């Protein structure tokens, strides 16, 4: 079976369309020169116009000027490092905090050996893997929210 759709030139309807200059989409349109010379530049120029238009209409506001002599009260990392930052901030021993972070990949590597299931089975019928995934997701969200709060409210999220 061919990956290209070849036209049936014995079809009289197709031959009539081709005689009129129509029907080229019936069997596929060539990439050269149609796409490369006409469609791609329109998309590229349209993208550039959108970016320039957004930059002109809604420029990003600058924040406060940096002052090297005044350090903020708490320096937060980027948002994707909040859970790791919270673990290191809450655990009293920093070596223990690093050890806790190495247990996460080790636990994920051990998980397939704990639950011996066919790789084609339904993932919703794998209770150990699903419970570990859901627990890890909720714990990550909990730690991420706690990292944004002051340290005295970070474990309870200020609820009690």
From Swiss-Prot:
The keyword Zinc does not apply. GO terms for molecular function: electron transporter, transferring electrons within cytochrome b6/f complex of photosystem II activity; electron transporter, transferring electrons within the cyclic electron transport pathway of photosynthesis activity; ubiquinol-cytochrome-c reductase activity. Keywords: Electron transport, Membrane, Photosynthesis, Thylakoid, Transmembrane, Transmembrane helix, Transport. This is Cytochrome b6-f complex subunit 4. The keyword Thylakoid applies. The 4 large subunits of the cytochrome b6-f complex are cytochrome b6, subunit IV (17 kDa polypeptide, PetD), cytochrome f and the Rieske protein, while the 4 small subunits are PetG, PetL, PetM and PetN. The complex functions as a dimer. GO terms for cellular component: plasma membrane-derived thylakoid membrane. GO terms for biological process: photosynthetic electron transport chain. Belongs to the cytochrome b family. PetD subfamily. Component of the cytochrome b6-f complex, which mediates electron transfer between photosystem II (PSII) and photosystem I (PSI), cyclic electron flow around PSI, and state transitions. PROSITE patterns: CYTB_CTER (PS51003). It holds the Pfam family Cytochrom_B_C. The gene is petD. The chain crosses the membrane at residues 36-56, 95-115, 131-151. NCBIfam families: cytb6_f_IV. It comes from the Bacteria. Its main location: membrane.
């Amino acid at each position: 079976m061919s990956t290209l759709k070849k036209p049936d030139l014995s079809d009289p309807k197709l031959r009539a369309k081709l005689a009129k200059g129509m029907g080229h989409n019936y069997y596929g349109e060539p990439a050269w020169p149609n796409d490369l010379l006409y469609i791609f530049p329109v998309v590229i120029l349209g993208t550039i116009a959108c970016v320039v238009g957004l930059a002109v209409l809604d420029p990003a506001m600058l924040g406060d000027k940096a002052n090297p002599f005044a350090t903020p009260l708490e320096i937060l990392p980027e948002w994707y490092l909040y859970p790791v930052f919270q673990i290191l901030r809450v655990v009293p021993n920093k070596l223990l905090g690093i050890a806790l972070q190495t247990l996460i990949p080790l636990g994920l590597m051990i998980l397939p050996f704990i639950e011996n299931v066919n790789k084609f089975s339904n993932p919703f019928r794998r209770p150990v893997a699903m419970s570990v995934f859901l627990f890890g997701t909720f714990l990550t969200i909990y730690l991420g929210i706690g990292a944004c709060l002051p340290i005295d409210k970070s474990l309870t999220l200020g609820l009690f």
